[in-house]
Amino acid sequence: MPEPHAVLYVTNELSHIVKSGFLPIWRLTGVESLNVLWLENGKYATDVYAYGDVSKWTIRQLRGHGFIFISTHKNIQLADIIKTVDVRIPREVAKSQDMKAFENEIGRRRIRMRKGFGDALRNKLFKMAIEFHGSEAETLNDANPRLHKIYGMPEMPPLYIEYAEIGTRFDDEPTDEKLVSMLDYIVYSAEEVHYVGCGDLRTIMQFKKRSPGRFRRVLWHVYHPIAPESSDPNVIVHNVMVDSKKDILKHMNFLKRVERLFIWDVSSDRSQMDDDEWESTRFAEDRLGEEIAYEMGGAFSSALIKHRIPNSRDEYHCISTYLLPQPGADADMYELRNFMRLKGYSHVDRHMHPDASVMKVVSRDVRKMVELYHGRDRGRFVKNRLFEHLHIVRKNGLLHESDEPRADLFYLTNRCNMGLEPSIYEVMKKSVIATAWVGRAPLYDYDDFALPRSTVMLNGSYHDIRILDGNGAILFLMWKYPDIVKKDLTYDHAWAMNFAVSLKEPIPDPPVPDISLCRFIGLRVESSVLRVRNPTLHETADELKRMGLDLSGHLYVTLMSGAYVTDLFWWFKMILDWSAQSKEQKLRDLKRSAAEVIEWKEQMAERPWHVRNSLIAALREYKRKMGIREGASIDSWLELLRHL
């Protein structure tokens, strides 16, 4: 059966380019009715180019159809908003009429658009959840460390610890300048940072530009003889040389219970020193930083110390938890960072990291780490791994028990959880929002397995849990929480539809057939495909209709095709309560709810869309055909339908 497709809508100046491509082309006249648009879109099994007039449709209707907006212009006028385009095509690409360049531009942008889906879910969760499971750097970037507990199983970064392997080289990409990268991975939960050797403040000003939220929530004490005054009220400049802990302690208020971070980046001028003198000076400076940090260990949660690798020592000792490579450093910079876990107050439980202690360092091993991971063409993924390793509490969400509101995004169907499907469904039942992969297309970038869509629908829907595909979830949040998920959101709906999303939400009252619930693009085609490939699947339905009885083909094909994820509890309530009303009452409820639809049959406006017995018949037939293979209980739904 076909997987979700995108409608790649191009504005008129690009329509000539798409005609030279190989994807289907859909010309829109602007006079199509709701049903015609629904039927026409349902005939496509691959991504399709479209052009023409869409000004009478709203953004949610077009997103429900899977529209991605592509133009050389900045905006497109729709019925309810002026939409910022999703893919802005450079004019030189449009002029060149190079189809490969055009499609590469779309593809690259769509990869980046995937992030919009996860970000929208997190925006809702940051207001509702306390615990975040399966977390990566994206969650840390926007989490509040004073409120949120961030759990996950992130990949280990390269690091040096006594008696352990360093790791192997992996593909990487360029990142920020090394000192900005340092702040980017070390600053998360600290409320007060004491930064010795800050220089001219350029580094923290660049960090402010890169991450204004994290910069603002820190009180910065910066120490350097040449540091200029700062106009930022949270930056306090101390024009001193730091020689002992006294120079730091006198600037600390111990009546405040805050998390503190100590950064030491001291390097004196070489002046007239020879090689031996210079190496001894550098070695002493780095050890002094460690000693000062260790002596103040009760006041600081952690420290990050400059660590230059000696040229003339095969082995040496330092006080450390881990030695870390420097993302963004030059390939020949034989300098690391020394992370020390200390004993001061912390918002993050870092007990899984060893306390800082005396550690023997083998010079050739740490030089090897420089050679593996340093370089201007590298550092982005190393930095992310360091960020995650230092600030995410290592815990498997599938095994975690807690009464706190929780979020479970993008990890439940990692291949390591295969065989734990009952636990996955239990987590989805408890979570504020959870995601599971249901896509059947090959996965090139992720190591996930797919849950069957029909099983997810039958297992996931409860009176207080909605189960929708990812596009439906975003459309639901746009509808119910427009202040959190904006209509102008850019995301790739076709990518989102590869996920089932559970949301701890009640059934809307009245239970209207909003776009978030009812899209079923291509349902008629799915039915025909079942018939032409295996007509026995339709025999019972055909026979019942000949007898004057009915079976809900809509429900039956939805389950048999495995092509859709929608909320059964809400859908049944919609059919039995809302669709049983008159046309006038139906329209009144839609208007009162501010709901929108993409399918409306005028001939069914005054009639119920299905009746209870036809739904029961469809479930019974699905059980007869698939009951042995179906992992979910169908009998519980039959019982519910009898009493709903």
Curated annotation (Swiss-Prot):
It is found in: Virion. Its main location: virion. The keyword tRNA-binding does not apply. GO terms for cellular component: viral outer capsid. Keywords: Capsid protein, Outer capsid protein, Virion. Gene3D superfamilies: Orbivirus VP4 core protein, C-terminal domain, Vaccinia Virus protein VP39. It holds the Pfam family Orbi_VP4. InterPro entries: Orbi_VP4, Orbi_VP4_C, SAM-dependent_MTases_sf. Belongs to the orbivirus VP4 family. The VP4 protein is one of the five proteins (with VP1, VP3, VP6 and VP7) which form the inner capsid of the virus. This is Core protein VP4. The lineage of its organism: Viruses, Riboviria, Orthornavirae, Duplornaviricota, Resentoviricetes.
